[in-house]
């Protein structure tokens, strides 16, 4: 069974993915090139989102439980420059602000988050976990925009499946379709079960084999493809599906309340 990433690993991987993002932006022929996986955005827009977003979350984590919403940084400091060297430095500073705030907070500081009804705690550690996936998926977006998409690193993707299910899917919002049990299986050897019902959705990591006939459907793929599917970058057809695929299609359409 793969381990849950601890804060030092999360910070290391955020830094690694942010560095990979900066490399794409630095070498891209045209920052006005569209990002197909983020309709309506250019690479410049994506860079603005990554930089300003990390600064905003840094300020939110620093404020801790006193924050009543996501803290917005100074507009002038949160605006990405167009000149390449200045943009690279601005992105690096944005990442460093986030890493410094998370490191200072530690994993357990109470923190405002947009998720309030999920299984993920409202803590600095949960923010770090989600920020890793935010940067990792947007790095893939940038790579895909220049025609060079690279699968998410194994340890990032394995944590990403569980993080997405716990934060973005597991909720007390009622599942609007027929109750179902879904198992996501990563070809790297990990699996997660998602129970969907009128009481909401609950996710859990599976420690052993799933008994035959237990889930209504099992969807298998690499952990990277599972994460990219969950974030809407890849279609359901990327999965090797065993069982009734309707719950998988329903999950793509479902937008549970936060």
Language-model features: where?
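Alpha-helical transition-metal enzyme core signature, strongest for iron centers
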Residues: 14-21, 43-57, 80-84, 88-105, ...
């Amino acid at each position: 069974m793969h381990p849950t990433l601890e804060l030092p690993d999360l910070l290391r991987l955020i830094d690694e993915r942010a560095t990979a993002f900066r490399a794409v932006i630095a070498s891209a022929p045209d920052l006005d090139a569209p990002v197909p996986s983020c309709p309506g955005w250019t690479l410049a827009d994506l860079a603005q989102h990554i930089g300003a977003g990390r600064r905003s979350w840094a300020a939110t984590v620093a404020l801790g439980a006193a924050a009543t919403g996501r803290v917005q940084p100074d507009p002038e400091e949160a605006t990405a420059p167009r000149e390449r060297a200045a943009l690279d430095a601005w992105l690096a500073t944005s990442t460093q602000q986030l890493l410094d705030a998370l490191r200072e907070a530690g994993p357990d500081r109470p923190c405002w988050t947009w998720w309030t009804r999920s299984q993920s705690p409202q803590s600095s550690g949960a923010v770090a976990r989600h920020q890793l996936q935010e940067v990792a998926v947007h790095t893939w977006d940038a790579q895909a925009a220049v025609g060079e998409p690279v699968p998410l690193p194994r340890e990032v993707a394995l944590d990403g499946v569980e993080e997405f299910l716990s934060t973005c899917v597991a909720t007390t919002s009622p599942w609007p379709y027929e109750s179902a049990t879904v198992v996501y299986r990563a070809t790297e050897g990990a699996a997660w079960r998602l129970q969907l019902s009128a009481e909401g959705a609950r996710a859990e990591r599976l420690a052993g084999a799933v008994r035959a006939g237990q889930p209504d459907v099992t969807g298998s793929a690499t952990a990277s493809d599972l994460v990219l599917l969950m974030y809407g970058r890849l279609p359901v057809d990327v999965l090797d599906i065993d069982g009734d695929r309707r719950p998988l299609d329903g999950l793509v359409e479902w937008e549970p309340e936060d």
